[in-house]
Amino acid sequence: STSEVYGDPEVHPQPETYWGNVNPVGPRGVYDEAKRFAEAMTMAYHRYHGVETRIVRIFNTYGERMRVDDGRAIPAFMSQGIRGEDVTVFGNGLQTRSVCYVSDLVEGIYRLLLSDYSDPVNIGNPHEITMLDLAKEVLEVLASSSAIVHRELPEDDPKVRQPDITLARRILGWDPKVDRREGLIRTAAYFRKKLS
């Protein structure tokens, strides 16, 4: 699943017990509601048919193997910064996200798969950063002199996004290990190679 099930959250950080704040008819609604429906169907099969299931709510993830034209923030910041283009930040950039390096995500999913826990579990790095500061950090890692430009914030874009990983820590003994800056350095090396 995804952290998008929380929509534009009114509870911060978001625990698995929070049901979310989703605009079902907004431009993001189809994706958000599809994930919520998938979770409901998964739990129904688990309850009524005894199917062994796991639900991982993945928060913003980054790392090597991302597509250069992915459209998400880190690939966009990396690609624009490496090419010397203006780096696009939506809105004032004060909306927050918590980005998790891919190897940490994989470890969390692996531990969940090996567990017998069937309810949703948040897997993400709880260290929150504004999108503006994330763009600046990417440019710093790249040693890029690209300018940051602001564009209109898309409708229903969440103002905050931060996982409460208390449950993952308790039942999986999981905690992210890779520091954001270290992850960005590794990701930048990959993007430089892809764009050369």
Tell where the protein language model's regions lie, with residue ranges:
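Conserved catalytic/ATP-binding subdomain
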Residues: 71-72, 129
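Conserved active-site helix of classical SDR/Rossmann-fold NAD(P)-dependent CH-OH oxidoreductases
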Residues: 36-43, 75-78, 106-107, 132
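C-terminal substrate-binding subdomain of Rossmann-fold SDR/epimerase-dehydratase oxidoreductases
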Residues: 15, 60, 79-196
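Catalytic helix-loop patch of NAD(P)-dependent Rossmann-fold dehydrogenases
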Residues: 4-55, 69-70
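Nucleotide-sugar-dependent glycosyltransferase donor-binding/catalytic pocket residues
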Residues: 66-70, 98-101
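Active-site beta-alpha turn of Rossmann-fold NAD(P)-dependent dehydrogenases/reductases
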Residues: 1-3, 57-59, 124
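Conserved sequence/active-site signature of Rossmann-fold short-chain dehydrogenase/reductase
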Residues: 5-6, 54, 61-63, 105
